[in-house]
Amino acid sequence: MEEKQWWTFTFGYGQQHEGMYVEIYGTFKSARRKMFERYGAKWAFQYNEKEWRDWESKRPYYIVESLLEKIDEEGES
């Protein structure tokens, strides 16, 4: 059974929520499913906790991202 964790989803250039991200707590598949339910296919990447920390530490200074929504499947939003 896959362990639950926080997943971060980003939006790409030219998308409605460009420069923002969503955090969802769940398994890889359940978090992805929730993201599709909320935003369809209009988002860019899915990161696990380690990948997101790595991206944040290497992200160019001119790329600013803001939290749009945080969803805990067990507690919902």
Positions of PLM-derived features:
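Short aromatic-glycine-(Arg/Gly/Cys) micro-motifs in beta-strand/loop hairpins
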Residues: E2-G19
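Serine/threonine-rich, low-complexity intrinsically disordered segments
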Residues: T10-G12, K29, E73
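A short, exposed loop/beta-hairpin motif centered on an aromatic-Gly-Thr core
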Residues: Q16-S30
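A general, composition-driven signal for non-globular sequence regions
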Residues: G26-F28, R32, W52, V64
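Short, mixed-charge low-complexity intrinsically disordered segments
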Residues: R38-S77
